[in-house]
Amino acid sequence: MRVFLRIWLLLPGRLRLSTYNKLLEFGRRLYRHGRSAEVHRLPFGLYLRHGSGLDSTRNEFNALKLVRQHTSVPVPEPLDLIGLPPYPNDPFKEDHAYLLTTRLPGTPLAYCEDMLSDRDFEHVAAQMKDYLAQLRTIPKTVNPDMAICNVSGECCIDPRLSGWNPVGPFPDEAAFSQLMRFPDDPARRGHKIVFSHGDLNPRNILVDRFVRPDGSRGWRVTGIVDWETAGFYPRVLGLYESDVRGIPVDQAIQQAGENNFQCTRRLLKGAAN
């Protein structure tokens, strides 16, 4: 497989692109709907993301390689990245890209959270706590002059702060905090800068059934996907990742203690500490 991939990547991008488009057409008929309008399941255990901007797609490609290199966090393997010129009707004239990855088993947690018991949530939260700890150990080797940046040391794309508009990079947390409400709050200083997924929420966490040692069935994390916003951020911001709408951390943790659990807050309580 590795030898074939090396040979395949030597072929012209136009030929590879044509093949991916044919697989995309076949996959749409075979699997109907993907996780989003931009992400599609293909035959042969593959997924294809297309239509996203080249910069964010390249960032995801590099993030996946980085996570696979430094951690045991289950993420897709990035196989190919092809950059393309802007669509003719794109008013922003932004380059876009095709990203080919392997497929991970499982279903987004957001689609099956009602099937998980309290015991299942405890297990999933424990896994996520371990994975987040591993991600925070990934070394930053890019752009030493800018502490807060994407995987390549360039602009960040953070839907929590600026929609999908690129911002930064930033030399320190004080400069980064100017994007937020109350930017001069002393609480927005002194946090460790760590590697972060950037958009971690139940839609991007895959879970699947498994058999426990005692013979009972439960749920476990089988993958984390959608890494296009990954980068190096203040650690405190990672607490918001479990809710892309940016509910304050103290409020989220308080809500996690109520009987009427919501999936996001249950995970945040167990995994974000």
Regions found by a protein language model. Give the residues of each.
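Acidic active-site catalytic centers that drive phospho-/nucleotidyl reactions
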Residues: 60, 197-199, 204, 226
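A structural signal for well-ordered alpha-helical scaffolds and beta->alpha junctions
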Residues: 57-61, 125-128, 132, 202, ...
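Active-site Asp-x-Gly
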Residues: 194-195, 208-273
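Active-site loop signature of alpha/beta-hydrolase-fold enzymes
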Residues: 106, 203, 230
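An alpha-helical support segment within catalytic cores of ATP-dependent transferases
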Residues: 83-89, 121-128, 134-199, 208-219
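Short, well-ordered amphipathic alpha-helices
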Residues: 63-65, 203-209
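Juxta-kinase regulatory segment immediately upstream of eukaryotic protein kinase catalytic domains
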Residues: 1-36
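ATP-binding pocket architecture of kinase catalytic cores
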Residues: 28-151, 155-158
